Amino acid sequence: MFAVIQFPGSCDDRDMWFAMSSVLAGKCSMVWHQESELPAGTKGVLLPGGFSYGDYLRCGAMAQLSPIMGAVKRFAKRGGPVLGTCNGFQILCEAGLLPGALRRNSQLVFVCDDVHLRVEKRAEPFSSRTEKGAILTLPIKHGEGCFYASEMELGLLEQNGQVLLRYCELDGTISKASNPNGSLGSIAGVLNKEGNVLGLMPHPEHAVEAAFGGTDGIAILGSLLDMARSA
């Protein structure tokens, strides 16, 4: 079972629930941020996009103090998979579960578009349904999605193979034009060192049906589901 965490201001929580339960036939439950424990039998945690607490102070800064985040941290420490998309990525960084930070987009405007992403590695539990070098197309919608980290942190991310997704051209080429927000290294998605926590700015939950944005999001969400079913 997957736990979809709901914060005040979340707006993609139901989309995530729909993608995982209705489209992929997984079992999901909504968990309010004031809860102090995850439901029994939780196999994965999903932190959705939106504007938790209205993005006051910094995106994710207040949400990371919610009671449920203590349980999320304990779950991650035990090796449980945690996925944060968009605002969920920001929350994971603020909570110290992922390195780096998400800053204002380099052009200082909100971006809403489809982007191409290059898969940098095939690994459980987030990319077992795809291959290294594969190109995914997913939507983005954010104003603070510029991934930033110190030079030392960036070096460690690359050295440890923690970069899972990069913004790219359709042919996989990395370019300034294909980077929608100025993220360092064109980084779109990063893992923790252990590989069980992933944050990404694009929205896989909005790309699970051919009639509505394509199905490339299944490569990520389906990989999580495969892990849960085999556990």
Model-identified regions with their sequence ranges:
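Glycine-rich phosphate-binding loops of nucleotide-dependent enzymes
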Residues: 200-204
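Pocket-forming structural segment of enzyme catalytic cores
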Residues: 97-184
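Beta-strand-turn-beta hairpins that frame and shape the catalytic cleft
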Residues: 132-135, 192-197
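N-terminal beta1-alpha1 cap of cysteine-dependent amidohydrolase-like domains
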Residues: 1-85, 93-99, 105-111, 118, ...
